[in-house]
Amino acid sequence: MDCKVVSLNEKDQFIPKIKSSDPVITGLFQYDAAQQTSFEKRMSKENNGREAALANVIREYMSDLKLSSEQELNIQHLANGSKVVIGGQQAGLFGGPLYTFHKIFSIITLSKELTDTHKQQVVPVFWIAGEDHDFDEVNHTFVYNENHGSLHKVKYHTMEMPETTVSRYYPDKAELKQTLKTMFIHMKETVHTQGLLEICDRIIDQYDSWTDMFKALLHETFKAYGVLFIDAQFEPLRKMEAPMFKKILKKHQLLDDAFRATQQRTQNQGLNAMIQTDTNVHLFLHDENMRQLVSYDGKHFKLNKTDKTYIKEEIINIAENQPELFSNNVVTRPLMEEWLFNTVAFVGGPSEIKYWAELKDVFELFDVEMPIVMPRLRITYLNDRIEKLLSKYNIPLEKVLVDGVEGERSKFIREQASHQFIEKVEGMIEQQRRLNKDLLDEVAGNQNNINLVNKNNEIHIQQYDYLLKRYLLNIERENDISMKQFREIQETLHPMGGLQERIWNPLQILNDFGTDVFKPSTYPPLSYTFDHIIIKP
């Protein structure tokens, strides 16, 4: 597999500004992610003393998996005080989208580089956001149908949308297998298809909860790298978090004030507010099989889906004795994560790192230092066919990744059309506009006639526009093969107007290039970069 790094002219300049150590952006974080001294400081930080307990919890969470020797060793390293690089993601259907895998590769790559540079073991940890309850965000994925040259949405259907956390959801296995079958119908048959399907079927048979199936697929893919997994909703982990839940409840108003103040500062720097929440407690409580947002009305803590209320002593008592009922929101999850782990760096997606930029004062309030916040690696897979099509139509890869192919497609259509025809129609449009101006001069002061002339002009312009559009549409139809090839490029490299990794599913890559494609023996060694990585399997 070949690997190269390309620099894109990105519309969103947040990550390029991190790369260049822009003082406005770096001021939103505790550390400058582009400076080596930041890593030296984090590597020398004193540990929090929770590492041995965490190692035991992670071992228990992964006890239903057959651990690799690398994972066994990393659990021991963690217990002995090794620091971590961490990142997380919701449990998407069949492991999707692709950037979930890329986030894990980011964690692996950075932890290895830090281990090599500082001669201290750094452990890669992936945090599964099993506490999330928005099932609509994880119950679907997309598959590319090569025969049609188009993407298809594949969705796991339920009679009722679950309102509990994803970790507490147990999907119907027959329905999930039907969803998997639908996905494979759209994918082309390769020598890898049957083996991949058997792996997925086995995972569905062997595991019961939504997040356990997700964990099993990730483990199958990344165990050789020594990645450790933990679910935010895992009950023994929640018991470790009880002291912090109590602190959050006691300081909830100060926490909310700190968050709002930091968010306002980011807006004053010209950034859009990323975290949208009305709560002033920033925790959820599981009650009546629903994950319910907690808020405080000045007297009571109340839940948003039932009429239950609690006084402070009651809700703190729940946090102490039943912490597994609590879960964090977007504000408190980073805080809890960093309170638990001895983190060198947190790896996040483009939106995630903007969330963290709104939390600096929250970390300071709880005397927890914000780690280095690193943008994850961004990766696109370029196969031989698409590379040949880019060459055929002389389209720069970097341009497609940012803008898609619509501009190049329109240019191609016009190149196939009669230039004289287009020029004459456009000339007629310009002539009509001049005529309209002359006629308006003739009827100046008479509003009825002005309206009449303008309406006449509008009709003529519409007719000429229609003529030109229909003519170009006919050219499209005459070049149907080329149009299909432009669609192939678009759906592969810029699907739904964005990067491939945001839409495509990892199973597509595994099916096309083999079930070992992401393994160390096959996948190219990566170097950490803020630019874009192109991999040619």
UniProtKB/Swiss-Prot annotation:
Keywords: Coiled coil, Ligase. It is an enzyme of class 6 (ligase). InterPro entries: Bacillithiol_biosynth_BshC, CC_BshC, Rossmann-like_BshC. Residues 422-450 form a coiled coil. The keyword Signal does not apply. Its EC number is 6.-.-.-. One of its GO terms (molecular function) is ligase activity. Involved in bacillithiol (BSH) biosynthesis. May catalyze the last step of the pathway, the addition of cysteine to glucosamine malate (GlcN-Mal) to generate BSH. NCBIfam families: thiol_BshC (TIGR03998). This is Putative cysteine ligase BshC. It comes from Staphylococcus aureus (strain Newman). The lineage of its organism: Bacteria, Bacillati, Bacillota, Bacilli, Bacillales. The gene is bshC.
